[in-house]
Amino acid sequence: MEFLSIGVKIMPRKCSFCNEVENPQRRILANENDDAFICEYCVEGAYSIIYGEEKEFKEPKQSHNTEFKDITPKELKAYLDRYVIGQDRAKKVFSVGVYNHYKRLFKAELQDDDTELFKSNILLVGPTGSGKTLLAQTLAKFLDVPIAICDATSLTEAGYVGEDVENILTRLLQAADGDVQRAQKGIVFIDEIDKIARMSENRSITRDVSGEGVQQALLKIIEGSLVNIPPRGGRKHPNQEFIQIDTSNILFVCGGAFDGLETILKRKLGDKVVGFFDDAKEENKALLEKIEPDDLVHFGLIPELIGRLHVIASLNELNEEDMVRILTEPKNAIIKQYQKLFAIDGVNLKFEEDALRAIAQLALERKTGARGLRSIIEEMMVDLMFELPEYKDYDIVITKEVVKDNAKALLIKRKIS
């Protein structure tokens, strides 16, 4: 907050119209002499009066009293089980990590001793489409905390073309509807963190726009600091006003596929794991369960960043059975969503078991993981949905041939009694 000096008194800037004092949620504009002020909300009101638009006068968002629910890690995992198929170990590790983080925020002050609890950020290691983002999104929804999701590959150091690391916090503030206090207890998910690894373990002697330099920039906000961010994102400039965010209590979750990490682990472990499995996927699963911080340093993440990601959980590559379950079992399963869409038009949509397996096999062939399932079904359903209103009172059955050979779906007219 800026202050105006008058003699020996220091007074906060106050809107000359509504008499409200400047704060992080109410920005103040001043005239050239710095003796008349107007807040952004009065500017909106004036615009509405002058131009005759019925523009809603918005007061700043009031802070939510975010309280830690009386939940346990088991309850967190049980909620994840409703939306995330498989990945049992990862869900358990993630639930404990999230539980400890929010317990530290809301219950640590109840203890009488002076022991300070440091936050433990989380690293999720697993192939594309294995559920890394979904884990974070699901628990953020359950805990009713804002979440910002970004791709590490779009980030650059300050001063370079691209997205500033600090813009992540702008997204979080937007997800919190401008409530700074709520944003400061939110979750930031940074995907593809492995894509900004150094190409070698030796520190670069040249400027590194999207590798080590971005890791260093991330380190500053992940470890906990006061960061000034532009309220509407974009680049900073000297005359701009900022909102200050304290990142000390924000939970940072980083995710990445880390392709090639298995090679590093095989080299380290030798015959301790390698050769005991007939299936390559099972071998990789066993290897990833033995990840240690040093392995990630060898991969190309800087030691300082790894030192801030205390909880490491590995996710397995999904198999055909997992894919079929993802299609049908979660509370918001893709098949259930399409069945609801069809039911609105009076149509019953059914999938044969072989059709579900064919969809799962196609997603595995494309190597897109679970996130590729929706696009496969969408491609398959376009023609049907185009004519859907004409099929009222029909059952539509999707067979294996529809998926594999682009055959027509079975149309069965229901008997209306």
UniProtKB/Swiss-Prot annotation:
ClpX-type ZB domain mapped to chain residues: 1-58
SMART domains given in the database record: AAA (SM00382), ClpB_D2-small (SM01086), zf-C4_ClpX (SM00994)
Pfam families per UniProt: AAA_2, ClpB_D2-small, zf-C4_ClpX
Chain sites annotated for binding ATP: P127, T128, G129, S130, G131, K132, T133, L134
A GO-annotated cellular component: HslUV protease complex
Functional summary from the UniProt entry: ATP-dependent specificity component of the Clp protease. It directs the protease to specific substrates. Can perform chaperone functions in the absence of ClpP.
Name of the protein described by the UniProt record: ATP-dependent Clp protease ATP-binding subunit ClpX
